[in-house]
C-alpha cells in the first residue's frame, strides 16, 4: 500500500515514520516514471553506461527508503538514502550539462528531487530528535 492515507495515531508520533516513508516512496515512484520516459531520449551510446548507473542509484535510493520503513533504528539507513539522493542530483546536473535533457526537464526533475529531499530531511530530523 503505497498511498498517502494517514496511518497510526495523529495525536502522537505513532505511524509518522510510516507516513513519511510512504509519501517519499510515492514521490520517488512518480520521479521514476518521469525519468524512465526521459532516459528513452538519451543517446544510445549512453544507455549501457550513464543511464545504467543513474538507474542503479535510483533503485538503491528506493531500497534505502523501503528498508528504513521496516527498521526500528532508521538514522543510518536514512543517511545512506540522503547520499543516494545527492548522487541523483549530481546525475541530473550532468544530464543537463551534457545536453541529454533540456532545461524544462532539468528543472522539473530538480524540483521533484528537492521535494523528496525536504521530506527526507524532515524524516532524518525526526529520527535525530528521537535519539
Residue ranges, per PLM feature:
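Amphipathic alpha-helical assembly/interaction segments
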Residues: 1-131
Amino acid at each position: 500500500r503505497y498511498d498517502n492515507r494517514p496511518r497510526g495515531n495523529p495525536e502522537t508520533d505513532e505511524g509518522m515514520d510510516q507516513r513519511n516513508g510512504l509519501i517519499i516512496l510515492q514521490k520517488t515512484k512518480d520521479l521514476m516514471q518521469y525519468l524512465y520516459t526521459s532516459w528513452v531520449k538519451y543517446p544510445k551510446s549512453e544507455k549501457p553506461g550513464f543511464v545504467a548507473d543513474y538507474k542503479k542509484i535510483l533503485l538503491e535510493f528506493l531500497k534505502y527508503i523501503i528498508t528504513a520503513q521496516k527498521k526500528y533504528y532508521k538514522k543510518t539507513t536514512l543517511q545512506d538514502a540522503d547520499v543516494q539522493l545527492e548522487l541523483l542530483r549530481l546525475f541530473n546536473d550532468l544530464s543537463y550539462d551534457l545536453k541529454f535533457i533540456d532545461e524544462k526537464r532539468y528543472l522539473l526533475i530538480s524540483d521533484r528531487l528537492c521535494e523528496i529531499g525536504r521530506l527526507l530531511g524532515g524524516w532524518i530530523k525526526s529520527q535525530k530528535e528521537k535519539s
